[in-house]
């Protein structure tokens, strides 16, 4: 917590090809060691592959995948009287998007394909069809929140 007032959130610029801020966030999350060109190439190649594979607009597939991966609830550890409870909380829209992108890339990274753009395209395709590891992660998170519903009154 800063002592000198509130820190303004920096807004990302929309990407040049699809004019979308979410795609920019995806590219920024793919990026390693400041190599944005490589990250853009991975992202755009994945989108190109999706276009070939599905015949649909890649942004439609991406948005469908994101909607299927973004969590509505999550659990947060809260310590009360020597016991730690997993308290279910609602996820803010900004964090929903961030978690969705993070889980999507983590799931893509664990896939068996040789190249990252194929891994990402495969995971996006799976997620848009409501299957895949990223969607499973969301379902597990929701299940955990549902199981700990009794502790919801400890919310903060």
Swiss-Prot record:
SUPFAM superfamilies per record: Ribosomal protein S7
Instruction: Tell me if Ribonucleoprotein is a UniProt keyword of this record.
Output: yes
Q: Name one GO biological process term.
A: translation
May I have one GO cellular component term? small ribosomal subunit
User: Which keywords does this Swiss-Prot/TrEMBL entry list?
Assistant: Ribonucleoprotein, Ribosomal protein, RNA-binding, rRNA-binding, tRNA-binding
| Molecular function (Gene Ontology), one example | tRNA binding
Subunit-structure text: Part of the 30S ribosomal subunit. Contacts proteins S9 and S11.
Which family would the database say this protein is a member of? Belongs to the universal ribosomal protein uS7 family.
Q: What does this protein do?
A: One of the primary rRNA binding proteins, it binds directly to 16S rRNA where it nucleates assembly of the head domain of the 30S subunit. Is located at the subunit interface close to the decoding center, probably blocks exit of the E-site tRNA.
Known PANTHER family for this protein? RIBOSOMAL PROTEIN S7
Q: What is this protein called?
A: Small ribosomal subunit protein uS7
Q: Could you read off the lineage of the organism from its UniProt record?
A: Bacteria, Bacillati, Bacillota, Clostridia, Eubacteriales
Write the gene name. Answer: rpsG
